[in-house]
Design a protein with these regions (language model features):
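Thiamine diphosphate
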Residues: 1-177, 180-358
Length: 358
């Protein structure tokens, strides 16, 4: 009697949002097949397809051998024969096991056929957490380096459903990254939560998560939530943060980012990929070129350190946390506002580290 009313938001998880978009297409497009390791028996590595085996026949939802090369290459053959496929690699770390198939076949056959061949393939790849060196790497930047692929990385249930719908409508190959840490996240940004109805989120459109006037923080994937936590602390020091969620890496929404940077004059990019060779560096370089006159400071990036991912007990020292964002913002953008030694952490010789590839 004394409790408050439950929220009216439809609070389904990111996992369930993916499932809604996929089952919509599977039930309507008989040419669409879905497969990967344990996709039928277990619903996939992380349960996105759970319950699908009661609806979708075994010839359209099935288990594959433990061979990433076979998973990708058979999808390519099926697609160029007129089919459509959504395939799952259990961890993005295993992209290397299908290197030629992704880099030289999936990405290139449309161009090599002068547009005669379509490759309507969605490659789902999860970014691991808590599983150490070989199962916890963010390889988004590796894929953005390959021309011919669309790359998306949703951080919210609403975007996961909408971007998956767009991916399954595309005739181009799409790599769809998913963070294992976000599978159980519910929607907190969209009024009324994730719609029951079908909808699409377009590629190449970022979204503003928070408006501010002092600094722009661009987030890629799961780093959105660390940035949101940092923004709460920053406002206590009169630093008003604008947060933009990239959502789509290829194509990328430079218009929204540049409009924000022209207002704030400062840019920090946060990604969980290692900093060396990160796509965040490409974005920072382009912003320096396109908005040079508007910048009050050089764009900065925060990523994972340039070394091997540690085990679960050390993971918070590896992927960027809100404290790392605060340290950099106070140290490099607002040194006059730092307090309690915030911004003085990591008193290293950064030039020496760069020379050593660290």
């Amino acid at each position: 009697e004394e409790g408050s009313l439950l929220s009216g938001m439809r609070a389904i998880t990111l996992r369930d949002s993916l499932a809604e978009a996929i089952i919509y297409h599977l039930s309507r497009d008989k040419s669409l097949i879905a497969y990967g390791e344990e996709c039928r028996d277990w619903g996939g590595a992380f349960g996105v397809y759970r319950g699908f085996s009661d609806i979708i026949p075994i010839n359209r939802l099935f288990n594959s051998p433990i061979s990433e090369a076979a998973i990708v290459s058979t999808a390519i053959g099926y697609a160029i024969s007129g089919g459509r496929a959504i395939i799952e690699l259990m961890y993005s770390d295993f992209i290397g096991r299908a290197g030629d198939e992704i880099f030289n076949q999936l990405a290139k056959w449309q161009a090599m056929s002068a547009g005669e061949l379509n490759l309507p393939i969605v490659l789902r790849a999860s970014i691991g957490s808590k599983y150490g060196a070989q199962h916890s790497q963010d390889w988004t930047s590796l894929l953005t380096h390959i021309p011919g692929l669309s790359i998306v990385y949703p951080a919210t249930p609403y975007d996961a459903k909408g971007l998956m719908a767009s991916s399954l409508c595309s005739n181009d190959p799409t790599v769809f990254f998913e963070s294992q840490r976000l599978y159980d996240k519910v929607e907190i940004f969209t009024e009324n939560g994730v719609p029951k109805n079908y909808y699409k989120v377009p590629f190449g459109k970022a979204v503003k998560r928070r408006s501010g006037k002092d600094i722009t923080i661009l987030t890629i994937g799961a780093s959105l939530y660390a940035a949101l936590d940092a923004s709460i602390e920053l406002i206590n020091h009169n630093i008003d943060t604008e947060i933009i969620d990239a959502r789509s890496l290829v194509p990328f929404d430079y218009e929204m980012l540049l409009n924000s940077v022209k207002l704030t004059g400062r840019l920090l990019i946060v990604s969980e990929a290692v900093e060396r060779g990160s796509f965040a560096n490409t974005i920072a370089t382009n912003v320096s070129k396109f908005a040079f006159k508007n910048l009050k400071a050089s764009p900065m990036i925060i990523g994972a350190p340039n070394w091997i991912a540690p085990g679960a007990d050390m993971e918070k020292t590896y992927s960027p946390q809100s404290e790392d964002i605060l340290d950099l913002v106070f140290r490099d953008f607002f040194p006059e506002k730092r307090i309690n030694k915030r911004g003085l952490r990591k008193d290293w010789d950064f030039l020496d580290l760069a020379k050593k590839g660290l």
